[in-house]
Curated annotation (Swiss-Prot):
Source organism (scientific name): Chaetomium globosum (strain ATCC 6205 / CBS 148.51 / DSM 1962 / NBRC 6347 / NRRL 1970)
Keywords: Chromatin regulator, Chromosome, Methyltransferase, Nucleus, S-adenosyl-L-methionine, Transferase
PROSITE patterns given in the database record: POST_SET (PS50868), SAM_MT43_1 (PS51572), SET (PS50280)
Role summary: Catalytic component of the COMPASS (Set1C) complex that specifically mono-, di- and trimethylates histone H3 to form H3K4me1/2/3. Binds RNAs which might negatively affect its histone methyltransferase activity. COMPASS recognizes ubiquitinated H2B on one face of the nucleosome which stimulates the methylation of H3 on the opposing face.
Protein name: Histone-lysine N-methyltransferase, H3 lysine-4 specific
Catalyses which reaction(s): L-lysyl(4)-[histone H3] + 3 S-adenosyl-L-methionine = N(6),N(6),N(6)-trimethyl-L-lysyl(4)-[histone H3] + 3 S-adenosyl-L-homocysteine + 3 H(+); N(6)-methyl-L-lysyl(4)-[histone H3] + S-adenosyl-L-methionine = N(6),N(6)-dimethyl-L-lysyl(4)-[histone H3] + S-adenosyl-L-homocysteine + H(+); N(6),N(6)-dimethyl-L-lysyl(4)-[histone H3] + S-adenosyl-L-methionine = N(6),N(6),N(6)-trimethyl-L-lysyl(4)-[histone H3] + S-adenosyl-L-homocysteine + H(+)
Amino acid sequence: MGTIWLISAASDDQDDAPPSDPRLAKGGRLNYINVDFHLPKARLRHAPYNLKPYKYDPKTSCGPGPPTQVVVTGFNPLIAFSKVTAVFASFGDIAESSNKMHPDTGSYLGFATFRYRDSKPSRSRPISITGADAAKRAIRAMHGKRIEANMVRVEYDAEGKKSSRMLVEVLQKGNETTPALGEPRIPTGPKPKEVAPGPPPTAPKGPAAHRGGLMNVQGVWVPKPRPDSIIEVEPVIGHLKHDPYIFVGHEHVPVMPTTVAHMKRRLKTYMFEDIRADRTGYYIVFQDSGYGRAEAERCFRSADRTAFFTYTMVMVLHLYGTDGKASHAHASDTRRRTRTPERKHVDEARPHREHDRSRRDEERARRDEQDRRRREDEADLEEEKRQRAKNYDPVLEATDVVLRGMKEQLIKIIRTKIAAPALFNFLDPVNHLAKRRRLNLEDPHSARLPPIVLDEFEDRSPVSTPNSRADPIERRTARLDVSALPRIRKVKNAGLNTRKHGFNDPFARNRPTARRTAFRSLHYRLRSDSEGESEDEAENRTSLGRDTEEPESRPRSRMSSDDEGDKDDYASWGPGDDDSMTEASFALGDGPGLAKKRKLDLQVETAIKRQKKTDEELFGVTIDRIGTEFPSREDSLEDVLPPGPGGGEEKDIGSSRLPTPLLQEGKAKKKAPAKTKRKSKKQLFEEREALKRQQQEIFEREALQSEDVDEVIPTPEPESEPKKSKVEKEKEKEEKVEKPALDENLYPSQKVSVLELPHDFRLDVGSLEELALGPNDQPDLDRLRKRFGRGKIDDPELWVWRRDRIRELNSTDGSAKTPVRIEGYYVPNPTGCARAEGVKKILNSEKSKYLPHHIKVKKAREERQAQNGKNAKDSVLAAAEAARLAAESLVAKGNSRANRANNRRFVADLNDQRKTLGQDSDVLRFNQLKKRKKPVKFARSAIHNWGLYAMENIPKDDMIIEYVGEEVRQQIAELRENRYLKSGIGSSYLFRIDDNTVIDATKKGGIARFINHSCMPNCTAKIIKVEGSKRIVIYALRDIAQNEELTYDYKFERELGSTDRIPCLCGTAACKGFLN
């Protein structure tokens, strides 16, 4: 039918066009059938399907397989190839890598090949990666990316054809450029441009000559004169009249042919036309337009004075060429005709339009540049994020953290455990004893006397003696070296200072600048402040050094040129060269406040007496008098006399008292003219003596006062305090007399409590009424009514009577005023307040003393022990017998007819289970426990906290309850126990099943956790295996009576050396005292 219809249609229309396809009537969409799944009629498709290729399978596929080699081009050949290898090694294991080099020059060409191999799972890559997948990942991740600012291309190169073709192209390009570079250097004759192209001047002028000349020109090819290199011979500046350019001088960047190409790559981001060069420098030429000038300005702003290899590009900008103005001005100047007003207006408006256009171009170029930079920054940031996410390895990061921590700990251990002990051992004074003796340095461990060493930081001894700081024993045993004694040097510029500043107060505290001793070691820094002296002695030494005038801080007039002149009279024994143990070494400065200063320690005086005879024998002089109580400096200089008879004997202390002030004044006046040569020195000396007479009276009184103490107590204890002087006693008497007599009632001498309360005071309404309180001290009833509501007590007298009656019933002595308390429970704090005692740990043994139930059990146990002691029976046997009799009586009472019927019924059920199951008896008992649980309850225990009690009689060997909790491992149990202790949970219920399993019933479990410990328990815990799992079940160890507490032995390990053992509170006769 269809064919007939087509023929008839053709005959009617007389049209040879083919009929339309009905399947294309609706655009090829057929709604009446799903052509994708049913194929009675197919959809018309003009092109075949693009089928997805089959995945390569090495077992079934043929051919070489997917490519595993890639070629990388575009990276900088000057960078280390290891960086490029490290980047591509992150995608898989590299089997082979090759950085292509030039076969002739050996230089790298900037492209390389990487062949990947199949990798096995490792620590860094837990998933295996095939070589084809690694190559695919490398192309997908690195194609078009940057490696150190250079964009690279990554492509497949399965057989190495691409890399070989690239190498051949590089070689061919080198062969083509080599003859061109060498051709200009071959000819040695004159340059071609100097040779005339026509015939010589002597040639004939006829037409033949012309024809012959033309034939010669055509036959001989003369090359066009062009520059032999990139560097132009003619100046370039003559061709840049209007073009904007940037000039870089040759003094900043040397002119070389190879530099132009590098400069073009350096400035490739700027739209320049060309870079030309001559002998003067480089010319970066831009387009003669507003856009070109904008690019020139941008290039100048960005690249001026930047690094170019090892040079600095110093640029000079020329926006309008060498003329320095716009090109349209030059074009308008060439026109000679006069302009019409309209033309003149147009010409005048043209610069403004050009300026506006150039400004718009500059703004557009600036916006484009900002957008481009922003896009590049964002792309770089995203690339950096991807690289960080790709290269992030938690194992490496953890390794770095651990290494840093180990380094810190190692440095800390070396500093504290190795360096510090070694330094302390090296600086130990014992190791430098010989060197100190050789250099005459003091012994740091020797008992230093505070008044002797007045300043440790001076570079000289206190009285300029040779060995005043050396060991006293060494000074006694060493040979006397007279030449080693120091010479008293003059004070530099002493007279100049006197003339400059006028009169100098000899008693002023002008301490000279102290310099460090050359032989000062650092061991004194390591010495403790408390070594060799107490805190009081350190304070006294500090105050003494601060308030007194030390020998080195005295005026230099006493040891100046006057002493230098008299030095020769005594040969090398100067009058001021005394030993450190003589009286001169203890001379203190003359100050107005010496009456209030501390006296010499009695220990120093004892040392003076002990060393007196030895010093006389050592120095060969006789010391007449030794002032024991602050002798003056002048007396100490006069006391050294030539040796006489009996000089080696020790004189009595009483004969060494200081003479009267008049005698000293006379001697000083006689001796002063002989010593003084200048009038100014004499005046200073007289003024000093006048002040000394006032101080000598104070010294005499103190010496007489302490004379008895010196003779009776030769070696007093260091803790004894010096007696007060007469002046101080008189002042104290005057103060006592001056105190006014005050009324004891108004101004009591002792502190009295503001509100005295009786010893039996208790806070109550009646007690408040008994206190002597004023109207302001009584409670404000109006304010109390506002804060609290009114209570309904009906009859007030009845309410008071009922309250007193309750107190009488609760009290032990039947008194309503005695508070209800437990004896021994409330223990007062030593300071009266627990907060004032600080934070301290309370031991378990101390905590158990304050438990009320334990106090009750303790009293019962003491009474029972006392009773057992009277009967002379063993306490353990007596307690066991009593428990057995009580259990038998209770069991006899409990065996009623109902219990016997229940037992028979349970026995019958048990026999049935044994016959059907044939299991162990423990399992049957456990099943019995599931059927009928023993009625138990928990309540306050007399042993500890809560306890579990039996609500009925329980026979022996009967199962009571299962210990239920959370099953955890041993390590988790230890962590939880520490966590419970830190969080304040005092009781943790952990029951061990075996070495690896623990039942934790602290937060999840049954009431079996409340069973307390006892040294004589009535229950026992067994571990049985039910259906493949271990269970903890509590059995009755003996017959248990109703309302009796259930206990079993915790069986803790013994800790005999522990300082905080857990006390046992069971109170039985066989109590061991501790759980652990």
